[in-house]
């Protein structure tokens, strides 16, 4: 995790890397995604957002507790719990999902697709509404999530979009 002042946004930003999650009511949260997925949760009534960044859905190996955030099967419940521990109300949670790019050759393992489908399935299981999904299969992206309005700015190599 890296905290810095972003001169373009004129804001304090916390950048998370694969395996990390962060919850805030003040700081913008950012990450860079390819095949990984970021789940961004918000409780607007409590002005709270959280973001995770997971690499794969699961692993067949034993995972040490400090590495669980790298796997969606752990990362999504961990983010939900972190939101609740920071004052969110589960019935207020809403989600936006990003990433899931497939850079590999046609016919190879589709890690990005598996990651994105898992996020949708898991949030549906938890009955958390998904307000936006950005799973364009061909583009990497950098995302910035804002706690005050749940706006997420997505920067692609060829432009910007707001969700």
From Swiss-Prot:
Its EC number is 3.5.1.44. GO terms for molecular function: protein-glutamine glutaminase activity. Keywords: Chemotaxis, Hydrolase. InterPro entries: CheD-like_sf, Chemorcpt_Glu_NH3ase_CheD, Cytotoxic_necrot_fac-like_cat. CDD domains: CheD. GO terms for biological process: chemotaxis. It is an enzyme of class 3 (hydrolase). The keyword DNA repair does not apply. It catalyses: L-glutaminyl-[protein] + H2O = L-glutamyl-[protein] + NH4(+). Probably deamidates glutamine residues to glutamate on methyl-accepting chemotaxis receptors (MCPs), playing an important role in chemotaxis. Belongs to the CheD family. NCBIfam families: PRK13494.1 (NF010017). This is Probable chemoreceptor glutamine deamidase CheD. It comes from Borrelia garinii subsp. bavariensis (strain ATCC BAA-2496 / DSM 23469 / PBi) (Borreliella bavariensis).
């Amino acid at each position: 995790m890296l905290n810095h002042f972003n001169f373009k946004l004129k804001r304090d930003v916390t950048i998370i890397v694969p395996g990390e999650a962060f919850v805030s009511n003040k700081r913008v949260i950012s990450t860079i995604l390819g095949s990984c997925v970021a789940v961004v949760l918000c409780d607007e009534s409590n002005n709270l957002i959280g973001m995770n960044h997971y690499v794969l859905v699961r692993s067949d190996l034993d995972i040490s507790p400090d590495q669980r955030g790298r796997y969606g099967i752990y990362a999504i419940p961990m983010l939900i719990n972190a939101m609740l521990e920071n004052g969110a109300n589960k019935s207020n949670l809403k989600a936006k999902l990003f990433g899931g790019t497939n850079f590999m050759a046609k016919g190879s393992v589709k890690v990005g697709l598996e990651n994105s489908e898992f996020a949708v399935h898991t949030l549906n299981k938890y009955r958390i509404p998904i307000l936006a999904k950005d799973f364009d299969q061909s583009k990497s992206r950098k995302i910035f999530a804002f706690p005050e309005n749940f706006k997420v700015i997505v920067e692609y190599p060829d432009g910007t979009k707001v969700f």
